[in-house]
Amino acid sequence: QVFRAPLSPPRSSRAEGRHVDDHLLRTGIEAWSGCEIVVVEGAGGLFSPLGKTTLGADLARDLGLPLVIVDAARLGGIGRTLCAVRAARAEGLCVAACVFSQVSPATTHPAGEEALVQDTAADLAVLVPDVPVTILWHGARSFDPPIDWWRAAMLGISD
């Protein structure tokens, strides 16, 4: 299902005189069952509404897939990401990795933006030592440090 308005799916669907099909939401992944790896992208966080009574966490639980938590590499990233990790675990979800994404080019910062982002990732890694933490720099095609995504996915599924 695709809705035009940049609103939550329930609000956007209502604005179009439609509704979110909860069955399709949960079974749409079946079309990809022959693939080795499937990435299901969520938006808005674990507690964003996807349907009238369905939250992102509900869908993640129903699909049984490990989570990759992504946040912008900026002030507050540790708190937001740690909150998401703890919320996911409280919901019985497995977190396979955390990614800090540099969403725009580096700006001039007295302490050096690169060092701040690296320190942020290192500080989070201390707080969640069992979860790989990485950075995706603006314009980069690989993660820093590299992540073995296959291993992360398998560890998440086996938990």
Question: Which residues does each PLM region occupy?
Answer:
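Short, surface-exposed linear patches
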Residues: 18-20, 60-63, 90-92, 156-158
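Short coil/turn connectors at secondary-structure junctions
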Residues: 33-36, 63-66, 93-95, 129-131
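Active-site-adjacent structural elements in enzyme catalytic cores
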Residues: 53-66, 85, 94, 98, ...
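C-terminal lobe/tail of nucleotide-utilizing enzymes
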Residues: 86-159
